[in-house]
A protein has these predicted regions:
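Short, low-complexity intrinsically disordered segments enriched in A/P/G/S/L with frequent Arg
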Residues: 10, 14, 22-25, 35
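ATP/NTP phosphate-donor binding region
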Residues: 37-156
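C-terminal charged capping/lid subdomain of soluble metabolic enzymes
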Residues: 44-45, 53, 242-245, 344-428
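A glycine/threonine-rich phosphate-anchoring loop and its flanking beta-alpha core
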Residues: 52, 61, 68, 172-265
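A short, small-residue-rich loop immediately preceding and capping a beta-strand
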Residues: 150-173, 177-188
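Active-site segments that bind and position negatively charged phosphate/pyrophosphate groups
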Residues: 262-378
């Protein structure tokens, strides 16, 4: 085997040879292509650099009562590139959503009938909601079997209606079936509408690790229907607020100030305020994906994962007794305190952040933060190693330089983390 250094040296030598020949032939009027063809190869390697880019475009729609007969959001999404076609659709619906909205299935059927010129529904499939569907090893094979049985092809649509876990599982199955079929998301939780549902990731859990297998594949469209939020229990409405606090802290100080000013209304789940939170949070996540320079996370930085290294571990340690938003709220508090103790964030800003989270109704302590390993170290610290492995490359954690401005760091001091845990316990 040729060593990596030797390989690149040969490639560089070949480039120099071609460059010299190009200059020589240019004086004689010879074409560059001729010089390329005439250049004798001095090695067995022949290197070609392939480069191309792909532009993605998908609408994110904010609406209400998307399956009302007069609402054209879904029809328009299906038809935006092929307006005169009848589109084959398989619809997968979160079982929890079907239980909360018993008339939803008939509404979908009536909607499809009213727009039969554009929609051909070939099935409505219930899918177990929550982390159950991401943990169950049968979920993806079962979905793939259904896609095959219903003759879904690369011009068909798979429509997922549900919380973030269902969107993740159905999205993953869709993106690996036939190397990717078109999928449309209907997020039904605050967490999915303002964060995960507007992104480009799909994943399920494996070997006890969160999102271990998955894909980066933008959806065809996202339709955020505020009517789904109305029927959520308070705990689920609150969970999505953690992601709004997170993205405000790392990207938009003005949005954080708005959250502070309206925390009482948000804690009461005022519909106008909750709608504003969802839109503001979703737009900031979309901006990061669009302008952050790394939508498919090829590098090591994950600014949108502020507070998540410990959150993912807490979800695992509590066997999902903490939902994602509750774990993220604790993670935000932990990393904000760390930002202060490490000298990056002004003193007192941690109190400000924790105060907002508590006014929104979050409990910022769980006894699993105190669970230690055989060396006496908090088990939650293992979340840093898991986080680095999931990201690849060097450890990169987002902390705060100011409210509204995140900063990347590449190491975390165990002693400071333990001090942060002590601080949270004292405030519990």
């Amino acid at each position: 085997m040729v060593s990596e250094r030797r390989f690149f040296k040969r490639a560089a030598d070949r480039f120099v040879t071609i460059r010299r020949r190009r200059l020589h032939h240019k004086n004689k009027g010879a074409a560059w292509e001729d010089a390329m063809l005439d250049t004798p190869s001095q090695s067995a390697e022949d290197v070609r650099l392939q480069s191309f880019s792909v532009t993605y475009e998908y609408p994110v729609v904010f609406t209400r009562d998307a399956f009302a007969l007069g609402n054209r959001c879904l029809v328009d999404a299906l038809s935006r590139r092929e307006p005169c076609k009848r589109h084959r659709c398989l619809i997968c619906v979160d079982e929890g959503v079907l239980a909360s909205l018993p008339d939803l299935a008939s509404q979908i059927e009536n909607y499809a009938a009213a727009h039969a010129g554009s929609i051909d529904v070939v099935g409505l499939v219930p899918v177990a909601g929550g982390e159950i569907c991401k943990n169950d090893p049968k979920t993806i094979p079962n979905l793939l079997e259904i896609l095959s049985q219903r003759a879904i092809d690369r011009h068909s649509f798979v429509i997922a209606v549900g919380g973030g876990a269902v969107l993740d599982a159905v999205g993953y199955a869709s993106t690996i079936f036939h190397r990717g079929v078109r999928h449309i998301r209907f997020p039904t939780t605050v967490l999915a509408q303002d964060d995960s549902g507007v992104g480009v990731k799909n994943a399920v859990n494996l070997f006890g690790l969160k999102n271990l297998i998955g894909t980066f594949a933008p959806p065809w469209a996202i339709i955020n229907d505020s009517a789904f939020v109305d029927v959520l229990p308070p705990r689920e409405k609150r969970a999505g607020m953690a992601e709004a606090v997170k993205v405000a802290l790392i990207r938009d100080g003005k949005f954080f100030e708005w959250l502070e000013a309206h925390s009482d209304a948000l804690a009461r789940f005022s519909r106008p305020h909750l709608d504003h939170l969802i839109k503001g949070c979703a737009e900031l996540h979309m901006r990061q994906i669009r302008l952050g320079g790394d939508p498919f996370e090829i590098g090591s930085a994950r600014p949108l994962d502020f507070g998540h290294w410990s959150a993912h571990k807490l979800e695992q340690l509590t066997k999902n007794q903490l939902n994602h938003g509750e774990a993220v709220a604790i993670g935000i508090a932990l990393d904000t305190r760390y930002s202060v103790l490490s000298g990056r964030l002004a003193a007192g800003e941690d109190d400000r952040v924790v105060g907002l989270l508590q006014r929104l109704g979050f409990d910022l302590w769980h006894d699993k933060l105190r669970q230690c390993d055989s060396r006496g170290l908090p088990v939650v610290l293992k979340g840093l190693a898991d986080f680095r492995e999931h990201l690849g490359g060097e450890l990169t954690v987002t902390l705060l330089a100011a409210v509204g401005r995140g900063v990347e760091v590449h190491e975390m001091d165990d002693r400071i983390v333990r001090n942060c845990i002590d601080w949270l316990e004292q405030r519990a």
